[in-house]
C-alpha cells in the first residue's frame, strides 16, 4: 500500500511509530558547507542581518531541503536571539563567534530586562510562515531555542569559552543572581517557542549545547529543571506540542533528563553509550542522532561504517537519523549525499 502523501515520517516517529527508513535531517544543515548559503550570506552582510531578514532566512532554511530532500527543515536563526530581544548587545565577529556585554556579577545580572520585546523576533516568525508555505506535505518544520543554561553561559561570559567556566563560577558563587537570569530565559523561551508554533513550526527543539560541563547536581538544577519548565509552559498552551531536547554531553544523565523534562525525543551526541540509550532512553522516547560529524567529513568506507553503526544501534526502535552535533563547514557535499543514500537504503536491507 502506498504511503499517504500527507504523512510526515518525522512526526510519525515523534508520535510513537517507528519508521522502517528513519527520517533524516542534520543540525546546521543550512550552513557554510553549501555554496548557495555562502553566496546569500555574502549578500546579506552581517549574520544577524541574515537571521532577521525573512526573505533571506527562509531561503537559507529551504536550501538543504531542495538539495537533499531532508525529512525536516529547521528554521535558520540563532540561540542568542532571545538575549537580543531582551535588549542585550549581540554581535557576531567574523572568525570569533558571538560577542555580548557580559552579565558576570549580581549587579550586572540585576540590569537584565524581565520581558523580551517579541516584536524584535517577528522576522523569525515571518520566516517560519514563508517556509511553511513552501514546504511539501511530507516535510516537517522545526522551530527552536537555546536551553536557558546554554544561553546563560554566553550571556555571563560575553562569548563562548572552552568550558564556559564564567557561568559555572557565577552559578556556584551567586546562585540567586544566576537563577534570576535562568528564570528570565525560561519565561521568554516559552513565549518565543509558542510564537514559532503559531507561525507554523511542527516541532520544537531545545539546544543545551553546554549541558555536558555540569556535574550531576548542577545538571539537575540548571539543565533539567529549566527545560522541564519550558516544556510545561509550552504544553500548558499547546498540549500536544512535540518537543526534542538536546542535552549535549549528558551521557549517563540522559535517563534522568527524559524522565524529568517530558520531551518526546532526545538528541544524543556520538559519545553516548548505545546500550544505555537503547535500554534506558529509547524504550521511552524517540532518539535522534548520532553520527560523528568528523566521520561525515572522512567519507568513504569509514562513513559507511559509522552510518551502519548508528542504524545497528538504534534503528530497531524509534530513530531520527542526525549528526551528534552540527555539520562542519569543510564537509564535502558528496559525503552528505553518501550518508543520505546509506540511510535511505537501509529499509531495503531490513
Swiss-Prot record:
It comes from the Bacteria. It is found in: Cytoplasm. Pathway: Porphyrin-containing compound metabolism; protoporphyrin-IX biosynthesis; coproporphyrinogen-III from 5-aminolevulinate: step 4/4. Substrate binds at residues 28-32, 78, 154, 209, 325. Its EC number is 4.1.1.37. HAMAP family: URO_D (MF_00218). Belongs to the uroporphyrinogen decarboxylase family. This is Uroporphyrinogen decarboxylase. One of its GO terms (biological process) is protoporphyrinogen IX biosynthetic process from glutamate. Catalyzes the decarboxylation of four acetate groups of uroporphyrinogen-III to yield coproporphyrinogen-III. Gene3D superfamilies: 3.20.20.210. One of its GO terms (cellular component) is cytosol. Homodimer. InterPro entries: UROD/MetE-like_sf, Uroporphyrinogen_deCO2ase_HemE, Uroporphyrinogen_deCOase. GO terms for molecular function: uroporphyrinogen decarboxylase activity. The keyword 4Fe-4S does not apply. Keywords: Cytoplasm, Decarboxylase, Lyase, Porphyrin biosynthesis. The record marks 78 as: Transition state stabilizer. It catalyses: uroporphyrinogen III + 4 H(+) = coproporphyrinogen III + 4 CO2.
